[in-house]
């Protein structure tokens, strides 16, 4: 009888552990997340110090994180006011980025894939974005075409924005990064 209780308890513990781990991975939760405004990053993703849940998520999704010497990657699922990004709304991504050799801003699905659109524009890079005289930029994320830097949403039902900074001086380990260090995401009109 004691052996049966032990086995049932062990099986219940394994099942509960599996359910909790699956839930953490599905919700993309992590324990080493750094945040600057709406942007969330995992500065330890490309290092030996990565937390086990982030490591499992990367193995599960076949994601290729940037190494610590390569740069940092950030994802925004909310605007700067904290509201979730909605595909029926226009957003203005504006400001600048910290000193970096190269950066990219990409529209991705909730699972991290590029979102197809008729314009075949999936993102912007620091080499091609049109900037203001002070070096800042404005990118409009919207379903319908806009003049200037326009990033089309396509037929996406949900999306996120990914900002990658390559060869950057930004270091979450030694520096407190404020919300103004990365671009702001402001909601415009909604359909």
Language-model segments: which ranges?
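A compositional/structural signature for long, glycine/proline-rich flexible linkers
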Residues: 1-191
């Amino acid at each position: 009888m004691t052996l049966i209780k032990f086995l049932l308890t062990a099986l219940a513990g394994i099942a509960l552990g599996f359910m909790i781990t699956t839930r953490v991975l599905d919700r993309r939760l992590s324990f080493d997340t750094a945040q600057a405004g709406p942007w969330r990053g995992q500065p330890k993703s490309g290092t030996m110090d990565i937390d086990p849940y982030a490591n499992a998520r990367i193995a599960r999704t076949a994601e290729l994180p940037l190494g610590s010497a390569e740069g940092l990657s950030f994802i925004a699922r909310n605007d700067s006011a904290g509201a979730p990004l909605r595909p029926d709304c226009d957003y203005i991504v504006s400001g600048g980025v910290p000193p970096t050799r190269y950066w990219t801003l990409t529209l991705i699905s909730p699972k991290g894939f590029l979102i197809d659109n008729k314009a075949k524009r999936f993102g912007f890079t620091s080499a091609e974005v049109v900037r203001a005289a002070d070096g800042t930029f404005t990118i409009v994320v919207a379903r319908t075409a806009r003049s200037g830097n326009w990033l089309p949403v396509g037929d996406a039902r949900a999306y996120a924005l990914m900002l990658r900074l390559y060869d950057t001086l930004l270091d979450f380990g030694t520096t407190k990064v404020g919300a103004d260090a990365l671009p702001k995401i402001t909601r415009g009109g909604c359909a």
